[in-house]
C-alpha cells in the first residue's frame, strides 16, 4: 500500500528541521476526538496552541474552518467524515499569544443536544470540525501548514447512569 502526503498532514518519514521551523503549532494536530454527552445543551472543548521561539513578542493566529483539510483527510485515510455545519459550533476568529507567552488556549463550543436532535446520535458522531491557524502577519513567523491544522471529531455518547450497590450494608454508629 502506497501512501502520499499533502501539506495538511505530517509525513512521518520526512524530517522537518528544528522546532524553530515549526513555530507556532497546535498541541495536538490531525484528528482529535471530542467526547460529548448527547443530552448536554453545549460542550466546551479547549484547544491549546504552543510556540517555542519568538516569545519576546505578541503573535495573533487567525482561526479558519477549512473544508479542504477534511476532504484531504478523507481521501488519505479513506474515511467518510462530514463537515460539521456552522450552527452546531462556535469558535473565535483568532487566538493571541501575549508577549513572553509560550502557549495560549481557545475554546470551541459544540451544541451537542441541538446536533443530536437534528441528525441523531450515530450520524452526529460522523462530523468533524477542521480548523486551520494562519498567522495574522507573516513577518518573522514560520508557520508549518501541517502543525497548524487540527480536526475536531465529534464523538457523541449516550448518557449512562451507573448504580453501585455495596456488598455489605454499612454500619451506622450513633
Where are these regions (language model features)?
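Localized edge beta-strand/strand-to-loop motifs within extracellular or lumenal beta-rich domains
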Residues: 110-112
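Charged, gly/pro-rich active-site loop segments
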Residues: 98
